[in-house]
Swiss-Prot record:
Family in the record: Belongs to the TRAFAC class translation factor GTPase superfamily. Classic translation factor GTPase family. IF-2 subfamily.
Pfam family, any one: GTP_EFTU
CDD domains per UniProt: aeIF5B_II (cd03703), IF2_aeIF5B_IV (cd16266), IF2_eIF5B (cd01887)
Name of the molecule in the record: Probable translation initiation factor IF-2
GO cellular component terms attached to this protein's record: cytoplasm
Gene from which the chain derives: infB
Coiled coil feature spans: none
Organism: Methanosarcina mazei (strain ATCC BAA-159 / DSM 3647 / Goe1 / Go1 / JCM 11833 / OCM 88) (Methanosarcina frisia)
SUPFAM superfamilies: Initiation factor IF2/eIF5b, domain 3 (SSF52156), P-loop containing nucleoside triphosphate hydrolases (SSF52540), Translation proteins (SSF50447)
InterPro entries xrefs: EFTU-type, P-loop_NTPase, Small_GTP-bd, T_Tr_GTP-bd_dom, TF_aIF-2_arc, TIF_IF2, TIF_IF2_dom3, TIF_IF2_dom3_sf
Residue numbers spanned by region G4: 132-135
Domain tr-type G: residue ranges: 7-223
Its biological purpose: Function in general translation initiation by promoting the binding of the formylmethionine-tRNA to ribosomes. Seems to function along with eIF-2.
Length: 591
């Protein structure tokens, strides 16, 4: 059996849609009530909380379980949505060992639920789904802090049936997303089937079951990942860079391997050369308190993985959230600095060629954004961490193509001087703290631009048209000939040449009238009076003749090769016939 001392605390990320109960769930686990102090009960800051194994066993209510679990506890990360999951990275991989995806059992899947699942699938992270808010199912009688099986037994058969229906809607949606899933107590193999735990984060029902499943997953599938060397040099990831009164710039980090001591030399990733500095103070949260509550810190001389810790040291201003932090010695300082720099360079994109610009607040979110846009085959010219600067704005303004004269900003600010410049420029800026929204907004913008470009083309291009001279509707024979016509396909416009089916151009449409009013064009199905200059009825044209708009070759190329899919069905049919007529004598016409 693995020695308990060699297993570090598993890092757990809580993900899910806004207002589905992530923070309430964590509060229940911690036994604190941080939610009440947060605006709108939505998590606002990054935090990390260590829940020791003894506290978990106490929640489970069975002291005999103490010897079954080797891990020293669970380290919970809590942030808005899945921001921390992408921030906490390690060489392009996810740092979190486990994840909880919280779903409101009554509302079902929402956009950020899907995004959470995509991220977890991409990083192959084991997770459990928490079907929250069971206390809001009609007729549910809450049993405070009770395990799910016990509270479920106390419900009426109608309520049990309602829960099962809602639960299997969640399970069905997980199947649609490519995950085999089942209620956790019916799962025989957690490696093949995802466990879904029904809970109420508000009443505490089902919370012991969530902890049990997490410990089980850690024990069964992560034992090798959790082994670490307590005596080795500390390795971690920067969670947040924070200005603290009396301390200046500090780093909130998650240490996931080795030990970090006061006085250690550390190397931290930044936009330029890596930062090399000495740890002045280590501030570790007490057990069951959150990193974001500064008054609860205690100074410590060293920390061992896994732990959330605040570092005070000189020169931390340029540190990047999501970047590596590593302990170095005099002997390997240059080597460690080189490794840290190469890791940062792997993420940054600066090709200088065609594409959009992406700015993000952390390396992890930058990676996630780049991944999503590349998945959609959107070219990226530049991607880096940091706020949108005046330089970025000027650079983007030099791009002529409106599809790429774009800056995407995730969780970043726009500098005031950049904002002034952007107001006067044609650069399009999209900012949000939700990745999928940025992708959607850009897709919508691209569609609008393409439609605008097509509209412009449509306005200048001569489109296909087909019409028939109606019998008994010759109003004037020549100079110009005025006849009644029915539009059989496409559109006819004034000032366009017309031809017969044999290819002979017979004249130009000089005017169109409908019910005595002059009109610029007429679409399929319309019957109008048409003035044709250059044609004489009885010579070049006669009643019952079918004529076509003589589309110039250059325009025909654009219609066939660039905007064909945007044409209406009758326009496509008319164009196809027109091209066939034109290519009888010249097969390469408009090719």
């Amino acid at each position: 059996m693995t020695d308990k001392k060699n297993l570090r605390t598993p890092i757990v990320c809580v993900m899910g849609h806004v207002d589905h109960g992530k923070t309430t769930l964590l509060d229940k686990i911690r036994g604190t009530a941080i939610v009440s102090g947060e605006a709108g009960a939505i998590t606002q800051h990054i935090g990390a909380t260590e829940v020791p194994i003894d506290v978990i066993i106490d929640k489970l209510g069975d002291p005999r379980l103490r010897d079954r679990f080797m891990v020293p506890g669970l380290l919970f990360i809590d942030t808005p949505g899945h921001h921390a999951f992408t921030t906490l990275r390690s060489r392009g991989g996810a740092l979190a060992d486990l994840a909880i995806v919280v779903v409101d059992i009554n509302e079902g899947f929402k956009p950020q639920t899907y995004e959470s699942l995509q991220i977890l699938k991409r990083f192959k992270t084991p997770f459990v789904v928490v079907a929250n808010k069971i206390d809001r199912i009609g007729g549910w009688v809450s049993q405070k802090d009770m395990p799910f099986a016990a509270t479920f037994k106390k419900q009426s058969s109608d309520v049990q049936a309602r829960l099962e229906t809602k639960l299997y809607e969640v399970i069905g949606e997980l199947y649609n997303q490519g995950f085999a899933a089942e209620r956790y107590d019916r799962v025989t193999n957690f490696q093949k089937t995802l466990g879904v735990v029904p809970v109420s984060a508000f009443t505490g029902e089902g919370i012991p079951d969530v902890l049990m499943v997490l410990l089980g997953l850690a024990q069964k599938f992560l034992e090798a990942n959790l082994q670490y060397s307590a005596k080795g040099p500390g390795v971690g990831t920067v969670l947040e860079v924070k200005e603290e009164k009396g301390l200046g710039a500090t780093l909130d980090i998650i240490l996931y391997d080795g030990t970090l001591k006061k006085g250690d030399t550390v190397v931290i990733g930044s936009l330029g050369e890596p930062i090399r500095t000495k740890v002045r103070a280590l501030l570790k949260p007490r057990e069951l308190s959150e990193i974001r509550y500064e008054s609860k810190f205690q100074q410590v001389s060293k920390v061992t993985a896994a732990a959330g810790v605040k570092i005070s040291a000189p020169g931390l201003e340029g540190a990047l959230a999501g970047s590596p932090i590593r302990v170095a010695t005099e002997d390997n300082l240059e080597e460690i600095a080189s490794q840290v720099k190469s890791e940062i360079d792997e993420v940054r994109i600066d090709t200088g060629s065609v594409g959009i610009m992406i700015k993000a607040d952390t390396l992890g979110s930058l990676e996630a954004l780049v991944h999503e846009f590349q998945k959609d085959e959107v070219p990226i010219r530049k991607a880096e961490v940091g706020d949108i600067s005046h330089r970025d704005a000027v650079e983007a303004s030099t791009v002529e193509d409106p599809l790429y004269s774009v800056i995407i900003g995730f969780n970043v600010k726009v500098h005031p001087d950049a904002r002034d410049f952007l107001q006067e420029s044609s650069v399009k800026v999209f900012t949000s703290d939700v990745i999928y929204r940025l992708v959607e907004d850009y897709q919508k913008y691209v569609k609008e631009q393409q439609e605008k470009a097509e509209k412009k083309i449509f306005e200048t291009i001569i489109r296909p048209g087909k019409f028939k001279i109606l019998p008994g509707c010759v109003f004037r024979q020549s100079k110009p000939a005025v006849v009644g016509v029915r539009v059989l396909g496409g559109v006819v416009r004034t000032n366009t040449d017309v031809m017969l089916e044999n290819g002979n151009v017979v004249g130009k449409i000089k005017g169109l009238q409908s019910e005595g009013e002059n009109i610029p064009s007429a679409k399929v199905g319309k019957e109008v009076a048409m003035a044709i200059e250059g044609a004489t009825v009885g010579r070049q044209i006669k009643e019952e003749d079918v004529l076509y708009v003589n589309v110039p070759e250059r325009h025909a190329k654009v219609l066939e090769h660039e905007i064909y899919e945007s044409l209406s069905t009758d326009e496509k049919e008319t164009l196809d016939i027109f091209l066939t007529l034109k290519r009888k004598d010249n097969p390469f016409w408009a090719k």
